[in-house]
A protein has these predicted regions:
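Non-globular, low-confidence helical/coil segments that flank catalytic cores
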Residues: 2-24, 31-398
């Protein structure tokens, strides 16, 4: 009976088609046009959604989109629930902007090694694109090196900063001008800085004075009371950013008499959101990375690594990388314009061995990781992984 009814329906459809063949052609064209319009809207208007669909069809997995998208010139149109981590291309230096899903912002370091005016202007233009209300909720200086601190005094002057996190290091500038500026600061605030080591550079003094005179701003030192306590924990709408800072005991026992020891006071941050973890490092290295690994209990599965110290071979140690087990590495560096030979091929090889996708500001320009139900990567310049896998030799073999 069913077969008989099917045959009748088929015959009826055939007769209808013979009577009005144009209707079928018009309907087919309409369907094709609708599909074409839908494709254009999705592909050009919502590139991230398109890439997510294609990733699922390719079987790339349900959690991570391992393909970079072109960073829009006017900035990313974020979707509800997005958390984004921006690495600005400042050449040899560091500048990380975090935009939290509840509307708060955090800036970690902001500088270029040569204090270049063009780089400074570009960095502020980028910040202005996303920080539209003239206010930054959090600013952190990881350590006192010039390529992390140079622009921060201007950041504090330009924006109302509510919270500043900084090293337990007193500014003792050699120039008479900045010496007088520091001496004029509030004695109660100066008494917070308990470490015997000091920094005498003018750029640190500029930041130091700007930070301690910022109105209505909370100053917190990057110091943990002990290894079981995190002094800096930022919590919000479904996100947590926990910093593992040097302990008071570490500051008391250490002498910051070398570049490596100064770098090692950089806090290591773990940003958690929607099941994803991002590792933030400053210029962390082989001194403080093992301390972090011990404090997390030896293993903490993460996703994205902000590479420490611009890809130096004394950072991103084997033990550290094995402990965090990331899929992505992003590096702030300028391979063609620095005397330090960063990033080192030795370091790059460690990422390659772990099958990590590598992004670099010297090749990719600005880099943005967006976290929601997936990870999406935006870059200013798209290059192949083969390009990003070429580092520089160590200075001894250069």
């Amino acid at each position: 009976m069913a077969k008989k009814n099917y045959s009748k329906a088929k015959s009826a459809a055939a007769r209808a088609a013979r009577r009005n063949p144009k209707a079928i052609i018009i309907a087919a064209i309409a369907v094709i046009l609708i599909l074409a319009i839908a494709f254009c809207i999705l592909y050009f208007g919502f590139p991230r959604t398109w890439e997510n669909i294609m990733s699922s069809l390719r079987g790339d997995g349900t959690d991570v989109v391992d393909a970079s998208l072109q960073l829009p010139t006017g900035g990313i149109a974020f979707e509800e629930g997005d958390l984004s981590v921006h690495m600005l291309d400042v050449g040899q230096g560091d500048c990380i902007l975090i935009l939290f899903p509840d509307g708060k912002e955090m800036l970690i370091d902001c500088a270029n090694y040569n204090n270049t005016a063009a780089v400074r202007e570009r960095a502020f233009a980028y910040l202005d694109m996303y920080v539209k209300d003239g206010q930054l909720d959090y600013v952190m200086l990881t350590h006192c090196d010039s390529d992390h601190v140079y622009f921060l005094d201007e950041v504090i002057d330009k924006y109302q900063v509510d919270n500043i996190f900084m090293p337990n290091v007193l500014a003792e500038p050699t120039s008479d001008r900045w010496k007088a500026e520091v001496n004029a600061l509030n004695e109660e605030l100066l008494s917070m800085f308990t470490d015997k080591d000091t920094v005498d550079t003018a750029c640190y003094a500029e930041f130091f004075c700007a930070a301690l005179t910022e109105p209505n701003c909370n100053i917190t030192l990057n110091v943990d009371p002990d290894e079981d306590t995190n002094a800096i924990v930022i919590e919000g709408e479904d996100y947590t950013l926990t910093f593992y800072c040097p302990t008071q005991e570490y500051y008391d026992d250490s002498n910051l008499n070398s570049a490596e020891k100064k770098n090692a006071v950089s806090p290591i941050g773990i940003l958690e959101y929607n099941g994803f973890r991002t590792v933030l490092t400053g210029d962390s290295n082989e001194i403080n990375e093992p301390m972090f690994v011990e404090r997390i209990g030896g293993k903490l599965d993460c996703d994205v690594l902000k590479v420490g110290h611009h890809g130096s071979e004394t950072s991103s140690t084997e033990e550290f990388l094995d402990a965090i087990d990331c899929e992505y590495a992003f590096i702030s560096c300028n391979a063609k314009g620095n005397k330090f030979n960063h990033p080192r091929q030795t370091t790059i090889d460690r990422f390659i061995e772990r099958d990590m996708a590598i992004y670099r500001t010297d090749n990719n320009g600005d880099i943005v990781f967006v976290f929601n139900t997936r990870i999406t990567v935006y870059v200013q310049n798209r290059v192949t992984q083969d390009v990003n896998r070429v580092g520089l030799p160590s200075l001894a073999s250069a």
